[in-house]
Amino acid sequence: MKRLFSFIIASAATLTAAAQMHLSVELNNNHLWRGIEVADGCVVETDLNYTFAKGHMTLGLWGGTNTQGTYKEFNHYLSIQGAGFKFSAWDTYNFSPDATYNNRQYFNYSAHETGRFLNCTLDYRFQQPQFPLLLSWSTIMFGRDRSADNTAQKYSTFVYAEYPVYKKDGWQVDAGVGGAFALNKAGDDHHFYGTTPGIVHTQLKVSRDLKIGSYTLPVHVMGMWNPQSDKAFFQVGAQIIKL
């Protein structure tokens, strides 16, 4: 018993020693997500997280808002990663003032009434340096992803592939494509990202770290196209804080 207790204490001490707090803040001209322009204007996105279990697990809080006050979002998330795999669960709550769903009850988790949704994602990044392809499967498991009559969960799913097509002299260019569909049609083909199954997101993102004296400023520009909605968006952003 004494040995077991000592082992538990030693394990806890090891995990604690490896644990780290992280804070990052990004400034973008809009907020883009899976073929959707969630918000426009000057958007501030903040991520505060705690990494433990030797870097394999992360608990985090994510918030976003724009300077006009028309966009407000506050999320919680958990991620587990190792050997190229990463599982994440995001409890997402966008309570923007003009929302057409329940944006007034933060703690309402009733499936028929809630304004939030739970998005679960499994990623895999190939570990070969010569083939760093990223594959991703995301399904909304709960929340405001309902049938037209609000009697069933649609389980809208987004599948995505991304590949770094260029990486040289500090520049990186990532190309990605994503499609969406509902696992449960529940009367029709509409899903969280569109009206029918199909491609809803293509992107080309160019990133580079700018050196300003001793300060490093990661910047990016991204073009995003949604063939299903016949829309396109352009984003410019920078990570202004990374701790």
For every predicted segment, state its role.
Residues 20-51:
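Outer-membrane beta-barrel initiation region
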Residues 25-31, 56-67, 87-95, 102-106, ...:
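Transmembrane beta-strand segments that form the barrel wall of outer-membrane beta-barrel proteins
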Residues 50-52, 80-82, 91, 124-128, ...:
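Residue-level signature of outer-membrane beta-barrel architecture
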Residues 68-160, 189-197, 235:
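Outer-membrane pore/translocation modules
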Residues 172-211, 220:
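Outer membrane beta-barrel transmembrane domains
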